C-alpha cells in the first residue's frame, strides 16, 4: 500500500509512480485527514509513505494521523520524502515512528523536487521545474527498485547540520513560522472555493465569496499555489514570486 500526503502535487506524482510500478493500492492522506477518517487500513504487507519535508521532518499532521490510524498487517515500511534541497535527519524520526507503530523500518529516500514553500523561498519557473523533475525521475526509479526487491534504502547522510535542523529547528519552526494570518485574497478572487476544497485541515472558509483563514494551518501551500487567479498572497513574502504546482508542468 502507498499512502501519500501532498501540498502542490510533488508527492502525489512520486506516489503515483511508485504505486503504478508496484501495482499497489494508492491512498490519499489528504482526503483522510480532511474528513477526519481514522478507520483502520488493511495494509497486509509492505507500506510506502510518500510526503513532503516540513522543517526537516515529515509533516506533523501526517505523523499525528498515522499514530491515530491502525495499519493492519503492515510490516516493512519505506519513507519517500521530497524536498526543495534536503531532508536533514528526518530518518531518525521516521525510525522512531516505526518503532512506535510496530513497523519494520526500511529506510528513508530523499527526492529533490521543485520548491513550493513560497512563504519563505522562491518557486522555480515552469522550465526550471521541469528540469528538476527530470533529474528526480532516476532517483524515484531507484526507490521503486529497492522497494520491489524488499531492500532497505541506502542510509542518508548524517552531518551536524542535519541533526540540528531536524532536532533543534523543527520544534520551534511550527510555533514561530507556521501561521495562516498573513494569507490574504485580493480583489481578483472569483470566489471559486478551490482553496477551501484543497485545504487538508479545513482551515479555509468562504465568507461573502472570499476565503478566510483560521488558525489551524500546516502551510502546505495548496491554497496559494493552486489559486486560478493568483489572488492569494502570503503577506509581502509571496509578492511577485512564481506559483508552482506539479500539474502545470
Description of each model-found segment:
Residues 184-185, 190-218, 222-239:
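Iron-sulfur cluster-binding cysteine motifs and their immediate structural context
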